[in-house]
Amino acid sequence: MVLLSENASEGSNCTHPPAPVNISKAILLGVILGGLIIFGVLGNILVILSVACHRHLHSVTHYYIVNLAVADLLLTSTVLPFSAIFEILGYWAFGRVFCNIWAAVDVLCCTASIMGLCIISIDRYIGVSYPLRYPTIVTQRRGVRALLCVWVLSLVISIGPLFGWRQPAPEDETICQINEEPGYVLFSALGSFYVPLAIILVMYCRVYVVAKRESRGLKSGLKTDKSDSEQVTLRIHRKNVPAEGGGVSSAKNKTHFSVRLLKFSREKKAAKTLGIVVGCFVLCWLPFFLVMPIGSFFPDFKPSETVFKIVFWLGYLNSCINPIIYPCSSQEFKKAFQNVLRIQCLRRRQSSKHALGYTLHPPSQALEGQHRDMVRIPVGSGETFYKISKTDGVCEWKFFSSMPQGSARITVPKDQSACTTARVRSKSFLQVCCCVGSSAPRPEENHQVPTIKIHTISLGENGEEV
């Protein structure tokens, strides 16, 4: 959305010499606006790198977040610098043609950002309402189509003024004014803000209702399934697990409940994070989309230039604060941000490649005298742990209290055929899983050793994702 100045509204038909620049004001605005632009650019780049460098963030939901960051990055890197120069100088210094192009790119990026939030709200509604069916409903192909629709619709809304849908431009090329043609103002306000806002609010109201209902149901079920053991028991499903009689049905029911609990907890937390993003979006953009139509349809009620500049930059501010919201609201993004800032991205990807597909053997006395490798499973390698109640008939993993690093002592559980041990760094949640494996030759086929695909996730003590 393009800045409007008072002299623009006068519709001057001649080019006036630019007024002298107030140096102190220019320096102050340059520092503030320049810092805001740099923060927005670096923050959105950080979001993109965090998703790109962490396998567990390679999901359709996070691709939507990357799309939002791309739109915000384009806005902060291609539009805001010229807006800041316009604000500092007090006049447009780049000519009429570039003014029109700049205005179109401005509307394109802002609309794409807003519609991206709309797509995210729909995605979160599906994730919370249908957590188990979500992967089949929201596929990568459908996600790509949704993102294409976002950018096509944004392009349609933004290019109207380039084809003449605007009021006559002033002859003074130092004036780059907002398009106040009433028809276009109504069209762009509805398409860029009010329709997406209505969808967002409806989706999050439904998310809230579903989350409250599901939370009550899952909490009541969790109370009946809690174990008396103080140890955290995590199990990994594997095929061809023997079971007897009616225990199969009971195990399936408990497994379904536990998987549903974890998936719902994960979707609920993502919905909370993105709900904060949407709340900030409404606070930032609503004033602008109230002021703009009022000024277009009712010129007598047009706000002052100072008020307009405030709401104008408040809308831009939204594209700079989303990178703050993610780490503050999500441990997942906080860890990803920290890894990128510490330049651990490449090392984590390489470690992940070695960890995935590793064949784990249960600890046994036969392995005691052999060389062992400690396999580091990095958090965020793209896998999932399920916390499931006892007697499920599935492969069991027990995680014990923290042990000093470098300790060679290995705790061997009683049931060596069904579980193996690991160490965790934190008592409250899983940060790093170090599993005991063997570098010895692969056992013979008649040796009953399960080959397990490793699945990891960060879990709280109650089973929720952290």
UniProtKB/Swiss-Prot annotation:
Keywords recorded for this protein, A-Z: Cell membrane, Cytoplasm, Disulfide bond, G-protein coupled receptor, Glycoprotein, Lipoprotein, Membrane, Nucleus, Palmitate, Phosphoprotein, Receptor, Transducer, Transmembrane, Transmembrane helix
Ranges that cross the membrane: 28-51, 65-88, 100-122, 144-167, 182-205, 274-297, 306-329
One GO term (biological process): MAPK cascade
GO cellular component terms listed in the entry, alphabetical order: caveola; cytoplasm; dopaminergic synapse; GABA-ergic synapse; glutamatergic synapse; membrane; nuclear membrane; nucleus
Extracellular side: 1-27, 89-99, 168-181, 298-305
S-palmitoyl cysteine lipid modification positions: 345
One Pfam match: 7tm_1
Chief location category: nucleus
GO terms assigned for molecular function: alpha1-adrenergic receptor activity; protein heterodimerization activity
Phosphoserine sites (modified residues): 215
Similarity comment: family membership: Belongs to the G-protein coupled receptor 1 family. Adrenergic receptor subfamily. ADRA1A sub-subfamily.
Oligomer and partners: Homo- and heterooligomer. Heterooligomerizes with ADRA1B homooligomers in cardiac myocytes. Interacts with CAVIN4.
Function: This alpha-adrenergic receptor mediates its action by association with G proteins that activate a phosphatidylinositol-calcium second messenger system. Its effect is mediated by G(q) and G(11) proteins. Nuclear ADRA1A-ADRA1B heterooligomers regulate phenylephrine (PE)-stimulated ERK signaling in cardiac myocytes.
PANTHER family: ADRENERGIC RECEPTOR-RELATED G-PROTEIN COUPLED RECEPTOR (PTHR24248), ALPHA-1A ADRENERGIC RECEPTOR (PTHR24248:SF16)
Protein's recorded name: Alpha-1A adrenergic receptor
Protein's organism: Rattus norvegicus
